Every structure is written in structure tokens, then in C-alpha cells.
Amino acid sequence: MDIGKAHVKAASIGIDIGGTKTLGVMLSEQGNLLAQLRFPTPPGSVEIVELVLSIYSELSGEIDNDVQLSCLGIGVAGLVDTTGEIYHAPNLVNADGLRIRELIASKVDVPVHVDNDANCAALAEIRLGAAKDIGNALVVTLGTGIGGAVVVNGTVFRGGFG
């Protein structure tokens, strides 16, 4: 896999766990796409964790030794609390109650951040996309299910689950 890593000093990995597909990306510090992997989302919490670790391993194995991997971000199609536990994910088989952040963080050597996929999409829009210079926005995600996030004064509004 040629990831176009010339002049890259830092990178991050993002993994989107959707109801039907799981997408892994590696981004440069400027937000440029360096690599992308896509797999069907497996049924079951153990299989989901194994897939996330496999994607992380493959993507992180592609970077040069002088490139600093800063973090792993995971977006989940469902309700996720502030500890990174999946509270309710109707389109992910047997994922409710999965402490995904805790399980993944114990296996990787970078900080792990887990959030609802719509919140992750909103963060991307605030930092790099259409909402970059806009204080307030509504982000709607469409996939196997439908989701949304509200941006107020440049910050993702957090509901009852954080």
C-alpha cells in the first residue's frame, strides 16, 4: 500500500465502525488521507475488537519510524458514554455494553478516543470541513442507520451520554 507519506511527520488513525462496514483511515497532521482500509463489520463484540486491532496494526505498520503516530480515534454507530463504552448500538450485533476504549487502549501504544460516529463527523467538519469557520451547525449521518450531531459555538454539543 503506497500511502504517499513524503514530508509527513505525524499521523493519526481513525476507525469508523458502522452497521455494515468498518472503515479505517490514516491521516497526516494536516488531515490529508494517507491510507484507507474497508471491511464488512462482523457480528459480535469480540469480532469487532479483533477487526479494530487488525486495522490499527495494518495501518500503523505502514508508517516510517520517523513518523509519530499521535492517536487512534474510533467512531461507533451508536450511543457511547464518556468512558468509551457502547451503551446502545442497534445496528451492531451484541455490542451493547462493550468497553471498546478500555479493550483497545490496553493493546495499543497511543491514546484512544471513542465517540459516536456522528460526533466524530461533526468534529471533522469543525476542524477540516464545511463547518470550519461556522460557529453553529447540524451534522446528519446516513448509513445503515441515521445519526446526528449539533455544533454550538464551534463545539460538539454533548447530550446525556457525554
Predicted regions and their residues:
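Short glycine-aspartate micro-motif
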Residues: 10-16, 69-73, 113, 137-141, ...
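Glycine-rich phosphate-binding loop of actin/hexokinase-like ATP-binding domains
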Residues: 132-162
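Glycine-rich phosphate-binding loop and adjoining helix at the ATP-binding site
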Residues: 41-42, 46-53, 57, 67-72, ...
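Short glycine-rich, Thr/Ser-proximal phosphate-binding strand/loop in the N-terminal lobe
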Residues: 2-50, 54, 67, 85-87, ...
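A cytosolic small-molecule/anion-sensing beta-strand core signal
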Residues: 29, 76, 82, 152-153
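Short glycine-rich anion-binding loops that position phosphate/pyrophosphate groups of nucleotides
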Residues: 20, 77-79, 143-145
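Glycine-rich phosphate-binding loop plus the immediately following alpha-helix
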Residues: 22, 114-118, 159
